[in-house]
UniProtKB/Swiss-Prot annotation:
It holds the Pfam family Dimerisation. GO terms for biological process: methylation; secondary metabolite biosynthetic process. Its cofactor is S-adenosyl-L-methionine. Keywords: Methyltransferase, S-adenosyl-L-methionine, Transferase. This is O-methyltransferase desB. Its EC number is 2.1.1.-. One of its GO terms (molecular function) is protein dimerization activity. It comes from Aspergillus desertorum (Emericella desertorum). Belongs to the class I-like SAM-binding methyltransferase superfamily. Cation-independent O-methyltransferase family. Non-reducing polyketide synthase; part of the gene cluster that mediates the biosynthesis of the bicoumarin desertorin. The non-reducing polyketide synthase desS first catalyzes the formation of the pentaketidic 4,7-dihydroxy-5-methylcoumarin from acetyl coenzyme A and 4 malonyl coenzyme A molecules. Further O-methylation by desB leads to the formation of 7-demethylsiderin. Then, an oxidative phenol coupling catalyzed by the cytochrome P450 monooxygenase desC forms the 6,8'-dimer M-desertorin A via dimerization the monomeric precursor, 7-demethylsiderin. S-adenosyl-L-methionine binds at residues 255-256, 280, 306-307, 323. The lineage of its organism: Eukaryota, Fungi, Dikarya, Ascomycota, Pezizomycotina. Pathway: Secondary metabolite biosynthesis.
Length: 419
């Protein structure tokens, strides 16, 4: 690593970069205070920069060897948290921050006190729990979050489903001569779980795997509730026809899940009269709440549809696919898009795709780990040029790309190719 002087100098330089990022974060949070998409993106961009600089500072402070050794530390920490979650420790600690001894927690859960002490010891080094004295621990804001069912489900999904795939990634790539995975039924995930020939989605949908599907749905809920709505960048009120009648199909959300996006579009359009249609598979549609004047689904039509089949609604002004296509290999993405194209009117139909758009260089943390997850499933996060490629092959062309600096998510507007 060089001399001690060089080490200390590198720490000081990293600290300067971290301090600058912290100051920028404070400044932005002070001025960009709104809940509009531009303010939200501004705050998120500086926060991500701060986190990245903090990681860099930590790595420099550790030095090359210790930084490499943290693979033991990180996996051990994840394992301890996962075990404590399953044991029920987070539920029995008082939420007001009052400490509890290991003896009390062990008796409450009927577990080995010495085992619990070892797990808790590691889970309190830098969180999420806090050690308050010998054998005594309490909640922190970083452990209280594990009381949320969707967070617990997300952790289970990440560690039980995806971690085995990551650990076996090198093995799978060696067996496939280091070729990028491109199949939803033959990939690092199917290899790790010994289900080659079956996709993750099909496997989780089996009745015997309901608990695993529930964890997946919890993970998707976390993603949906923490994401910034990039569709807010699109001028719906200006684009959608003000002369639309009640029969005009204004927007179709394909694979729209719970319907939050199509409901948001209706609001962004100023509740223009017309049809707003939510499409998804039967099991999703059947679990939606009943529409009512007080429901967010008020004014939204629901329709069972599999996007691997031809789009049944023709001539809609807007077709939306939000955060779906990254889950599929290129061949499947093209198939999905080709099922939409014949339904689009050349004159006024637009396809909006909200997805991560991976930068050509200097990509951030989120798009990095998200792409690794997609790699495990034979899919990928795409650069703008890669998005243009799959759209072009399907008979579409990019018209406009809506993005905000520092944010990897964006909105692509496409139309049927000109003849």
């Amino acid at each position: 690593m060089g001399t001690e002087t060089e080490y200390l100098q590198s720490i000081q330089q990293a600290l300067k970069s971290l301090t600058t990022a912290a100051n920028n974060c404070q400044l932005t949070y002070t001025h960009a205070v709104g809940q509009d998409v531009h303010s939200l993106c501004a705050r998120e961009a500086v926060r991500k920069t701060l986190v990245l600089e903090a990681y860099k500072f930590l790595q420099i402070a550790q030095g090359p060897v210790d930084a490499a050794v943290t693979c033991f530390e990180q996996t051990a920490h994840l394992a301890s948290v996962r075990a404590l979650l399953e044991a029920g420790v987070f539920e029995v600690l008082p939420t007001d921050g009052t400490p509890r001894t290991m003896k009390e927690v062990a008796e409450k859960l009927d577990v080995d006190e010495s085992l619990l002490a070892r797990l808790m010891r590691h889970a309190s080094l830098y969180g999420p729990l806090e050690e308050t004295g010998p054998g005594s621990y309490r909640h922190t804001p970083f452990s209280l979050v594990y009381l949320r069912p969707e967070i617990r489900g997300m952790v289970r999904f990440a560690m039980d489903e995806h971690m085995p795939a990551h650990l076996k990634l090198h093995e799978y790539l060696q067996q496939t001569s280091w070729t990028a995975p491109s199949s939803s039924t033959n990939n690092p995930y199917t290899h790790a779980h010994s289900i080659t020939g079956t996709s993750m989605f099909a496997n989780l949908s089996a009745p015997s795997n309901k608990h695993r599907l529930d964890a997946f749905n919890d993970a998707m809920t976390v993603q949906a509730t923490t994401a910034i709505w990039m569709i807010d960048l699109f001028p719906f009120h200006e684009v959608l026809s003000p002369s639309a009648s009640a029969d005009t199909v204004l927007a179709v959300d394909i694979g729209g899940g719970t319907g939050r996006a199509i409901s948001r579009i209706r609001s962004l359009a100023g509740n223009l009269p017309g049809r707003y249609i939510l499409q998804d598979q039967a099991h999703v549609i059947s679990n939606l709440p009943s529409p009512s004047p007080s429901s967010y689904l008020d004014g939204i039509e629901t329709m069972t549809h599999d996007f691997f089949t031809p789009q049944p609604v023709a001539g809609a002004q807007i077709y939306l696919i939000r955060r779906c296509l990254h889950n599929w290999p290129e061949e499947s993405v093209i198939r999905i898009l080709r099922n939409i194209v014949p339904a689009m009117a050349r004159t006024n139909s637009r396809l909006l795709i909200e997805e991560i758009i991976v930068p050509e260089s200097n990509s951030g943390i989120e798009e990095g780990w998200m792409d690794m997850i997609m790699m495990a499933l034979g899919a990928k996060q795409r650069t703008l040029e890669e998005w243009k490629g799959v759209l072009g092959t399907a008979g579409l062309e990019v018209v406009t790309v809506y993005r905000v600096d520092g944010i990897c998510h964006g909105l692509i507007e496409a139309r049927v190719k000109s003849e």
